[in-house]
Amino acid sequence: IRFEGIPASAYIKGAFDSTLTFDDGTYAVIDFKTSTPNPAHVAFYGRQLSAYAWALEHPGERALRLSPITRLGLLYLDPVDIAHGADHRHITYGGEVTWTEIPKEESNFMQFMQGVLSLLSLPEPPPPSETCGFCAYRADARKHGL
C-alpha cells in the first residue's frame, strides 16, 4: 500500500478464515467466532476483515485474487451444549449460529492506513497521547520488554 507523498509503504499478509462465492460472481470474507455475538466486535474485527478484503482484491504476484468482495462478516457459534466423545478425542458443540454483517468501507480502511504510514514516516514518534489506544499498547509492550 503506497500513498503519494508518504515514504513508508506496507503490504498485508494474513490468514482469513473463509470466503463465500455468490451466484453473481461476488465474494464475502468471513471470520468465525466461538462466542456470544457482541456489537463491539464489528469495530474491533472490521479493520481486520477490511485488510483481508483489500489484500484479496489487490493481491501480490502468485497470490489469491478474489474480486469484487461485496460483503464482510462474523459467523458466530455461541456454544450452549458441549459433549465429549467417549474417547475424549472428539468434542461436539451445540448452540446458536449468528451472522453479523460488517460494512465494507474501503475508504475508511485506506484513510486509516494512510494515517499509519504517515506516522511511520516521521523521523521520531510523536509524543504519546492519553487517549491513544496504540500509544497505551506501545507503552505496555515496552514496560513488559516486548
What are these language model-derived features?
Residues 34-36, 79-80:
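Short acidic/polar capping segments at secondary-structure boundaries
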Residues 38-46:
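Active-site metal-coordination segments of metallo-dependent hydrolases
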Residues 45-59:
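An active-site-proximal "capping" alpha-helix that borders the catalytic cofactor pocket
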Residues 58-146:
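Metal-dependent nuclease catalytic regions and adjoining charged, substrate-binding loops involved
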Residues 1-29, 35-37, 61-70:
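Catalytic cores of nuclease domains that cleave nucleic-acid phosphodiester backbones
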Residues 13-15, 46, 99:
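Well-ordered beta-strand positions in beta-sheet-rich domains
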Residues 11-13, 44, 127:
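A generic fold-level signal
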